[in-house]
């Protein structure tokens, strides 16, 4: 894992991206997925195959898109310091937008929780809603996420110090922990005594935890890509933008989950 200087051989600091089909393919795949989910939820489609095919299309488009980006960075030397700075700034803006989305969902939850109406029985949680104990699976998931923060920080320090073996171990352990989190979240949904259609409590609960769970699935894929790139000698101790953005993404989701645990599971139950 020596310093990679291939990104400094260009005569200008900008990356002039060539024509790529993957943005439009990904956009149409996401539109197909959204339509399939909406039509299935409202009973217009009786089969889950359209959703399954849409997910395959999204993953296929994103995989080939990421493949091109990795080739541009690692093998073509297109990612100069200016390009890396732009990628980091763009990802920070993405993180800010994600925080604002979760802030709006917290607002919706607290708007009803702090002032429950007569329709909710003048109490929160509403009458007849069996809440999930914060001392069971939610607490276990919180411990798992905190542990993943430790292992990914271990991987980050190993990467900066040029220790490929420990970096590989750190990312592998982190990937396993995040996958366990997603699995336990699935178990929690399976045994929950309420659904998305159970009033404002069910809709806000599953919107918050479900959106976070979707991001955790995305994070699992990102960690798997980082683990593979470390194994493939793609990262160096000075050039690892993909790893840094993934690590930042994990820490942001950790903090958001702590707010979900405190507000939704502990205070809200």
Curated annotation (Swiss-Prot):
It comes from the Eukaryota. PANTHER family: CYTOCHROME C OXIDASE SUBUNIT 3, CYTOCHROME C OXIDASE SUBUNIT III. It catalyses: 4 Fe(II)-[cytochrome c] + O2 + 8 H(+)(in) = 4 Fe(III)-[cytochrome c] + 2 H2O + 4 H(+)(out). Pfam families: COX3 (PF00510). PROSITE patterns: COX3 (PS50253). Belongs to the cytochrome c oxidase subunit 3 family. The keyword DNA-binding does not apply. The chain crosses the membrane at residues 21-41, 45-65, 90-110, 127-147, 167-187, 205-225, 247-267. This is Cytochrome c oxidase subunit 3. Component of the cytochrome c oxidase (complex IV, CIV), a multisubunit enzyme composed of a catalytic core of 3 subunits and several supernumerary subunits. The complex exists as a monomer or a dimer and forms supercomplexes (SCs) in the inner mitochondrial membrane with ubiquinol-cytochrome c oxidoreductase (cytochrome b-c1 complex, complex III, CIII). Its EC number is 7.1.1.9. It is a multi-pass membrane protein. Its main location: mitochondrion. Keywords: Membrane, Mitochondrion, Mitochondrion inner membrane, Translocase, Transmembrane, Transmembrane helix. One of its GO terms (molecular function) is cytochrome-c oxidase activity. It is found in: Mitochondrion inner membrane. GO terms for cellular component: mitochondrial inner membrane; mitochondrion; respiratory chain complex IV. SUPFAM superfamilies: Cytochrome c oxidase subunit III-like. The keyword Flavoprotein does not apply. Component of the cytochrome c oxidase, the last enzyme in the mitochondrial electron transport chain which drives oxidative phosphorylation. The respiratory chain contains 3 multisubunit complexes succinate dehydrogenase (complex II, CII), ubiquinol-cytochrome c oxidoreductase (cytochrome b-c1 complex, complex III, CIII) and cytochrome c oxidase (complex IV, CIV), that cooperate to transfer electrons derived from NADH and succinate to molecular oxygen, creating an electrochemical gradient over the inner membrane that drives transmembrane transport and the ATP synthase. One of its GO terms (biological process) is mitochondrial electron transport, cytochrome c to oxygen.
